[in-house]
């Protein structure tokens, strides 16, 4: 189980990312449209003035049961440990163990 403070920090980052998503996107589009370098620098300054935690690269995908930050499967939203346990207990319909 991940520490609760880390899980809360990621939730806060997700909220900030959603809040500033459109602002960040519009500023990035403006950078590509503006031909003058001096105008681009002004836009870069605006972009850098946004909160650091609002950048989407600072988000981390976590297991929604345990909060584990590594070995996550996107399709299920689970870490590999919990996914294996749930498949063996037949709690995930349609998931089968591979054998060849």
Curated annotation (Swiss-Prot):
GO terms for molecular function: rRNA binding; structural constituent of ribosome. It is found in: Plastid. GO terms for cellular component: plastid; small ribosomal subunit. Keywords: Plastid, Ribonucleoprotein, Ribosomal protein, RNA-binding, rRNA-binding. One of its GO terms (biological process) is translation. It comes from the Eukaryota. Its main location: plastid. Binds 16S rRNA, required for the assembly of 30S particles. NCBIfam families: PRK08881.1 (NF006477). Belongs to the universal ribosomal protein uS14 family. PANTHER family: 30S RIBOSOMAL PROTEIN S14, SMALL RIBOSOMAL SUBUNIT PROTEIN US14M. Part of the 30S ribosomal subunit. This is Small ribosomal subunit protein uS14c. The lineage of its organism: Eukaryota, Viridiplantae, Streptophyta, Embryophyta, Tracheophyta. The gene is rps14.
